[in-house]
Amino acid sequence: MIKETDLENIPDLLIKFNEPLSNYTYTKVGGPADILAFPATIEALTELSAKAKATDTPVTVLGNASNLIVRDGGIRGLVILLEKLDSVKVAGYTIEAQAGAKLKEVTQVAQANSLTGFEFACGIPGSIGGAVFMNAGAYGGEISQVLVSCKVMDAEGNVSVLSASEMQFGYRHSVIRDKNLIVLSAKFELQAGDPTQIQNEMDRLNFLRESKQPLEYPSCGSVFKRPVGHFAGQLIQEAKLQGQRIGGVEVSKKHAGFMVNVADGNATDYEKLIALVIEKVKENSGVTLEPEVRIIGEK
């Protein structure tokens, strides 16, 4: 296991020990990370990864911790949060954003530079790294439609660039998950647009999101993938599960596809409620819901 002395001389690196991950997740649940690291440069991340490999320390990389549930026992070993790797650069019709850059901020950069095609992501509460990892999408758009390449690091510390076709994108899926890669940055190809029209479209999508989603409570976003031929929220509603509560977590009364932390809930509450919803929807409709949210850590 990596020691504090192994990390002291790495520049541009903030380290916290036994840090509750509930301080960083959108659900406000999650036990402690043994070691929580915030690299501010790619060089710091590379050196940190090398130290972890040399000491056989397990590594978990998180983006913005939005579509994620960390279990109450926390995560052993080293947890890396990429939020400080957040630079965004524009060159012509191309935007290159580091993994920790927030989607919302990247869409604002696109609008300011009269670039269209990224509006769909304006309300997704995640980072570029997490969005690429799961091919995030909303309102008919998804990352795979605009990504042209992705710079990644593997478990050995090797850095490479994957083309869009090499990403093997699917619905809420990419090769990043399959091969346990770390997203360093991504390039997006957009088109010239009118900044006023782009802003109007972003305002429209944000209004839809705010009117339909329970943004007033902590949540992990959309809990389930969309089943073929159905909408998860509608199936949950038809099973009369809106308002169903376990501990401090309930199926949102505003949007059945969300589970919200209304009263100091924990990850166990989330997992039990997810299991209950899957069971009841299956009984009611015959459809088996599949979680979209990523669940990690120890119980």
Swiss-Prot record:
Gene3D superfamilies per record: 3.30.465.10, UDP-N-acetylenolpyruvoylglucosamine reductase, C-terminal domain, Uridine Diphospho-n-acetylenolpyruvylglucosamine Reductase, domain 2
UniProt keyword annotation of Cell cycle present: yes
Gene Ontology biological-process annotations: cell division; cell wall organization; peptidoglycan biosynthetic process; regulation of cell shape
Active site: 172, 222 (proton donor), 292
Cell cycle found in the keyword field: yes
Catalytic activity: UDP-N-acetyl-alpha-D-muramate + NADP(+) = UDP-N-acetyl-3-O-(1-carboxyvinyl)-alpha-D-glucosamine + NADPH + H(+)
Subcellular location: Cytoplasm
UniProt EC number: 1.3.1.98
Pathway given in the UniProt record: Cell wall biogenesis; peptidoglycan biosynthesis
GO molecular function, one term: FAD binding
Keywords recorded for this protein, A-Z: Cell cycle, Cell division, Cell shape, Cell wall biogenesis/degradation, Cytoplasm, FAD, Flavoprotein, NADP, Oxidoreductase, Peptidoglycan synthesis
UniProt xrefs under SUPFAM superfamilies: FAD-binding/transporter-associated domain-like (SSF56176), Uridine diphospho-N-Acetylenolpyruvylglucosamine reductase, MurB, C-terminal domain (SSF56194)
Cofactor: FAD
Pfam families, per the entry: FAD_binding_4, MurB_C
InterPro entries: FAD-bd_PCMH (IPR016166), FAD-bd_PCMH-like_sf (IPR036318), FAD-bd_PCMH_sub1 (IPR016167), FAD-bd_PCMH_sub2 (IPR016169), MurB (IPR003170), MurB_C (IPR011601), MurB_C_sf (IPR036635), Oxid_FAD_bind_N (IPR006094)
Functional note: Cell wall formation.
PANTHER family per the UniProt record, alphabetical: UDP-N-ACETYLENOLPYRUVOYLGLUCOSAMINE REDUCTASE
Name the UniProt record assigns to this protein: UDP-N-acetylenolpyruvoylglucosamine reductase
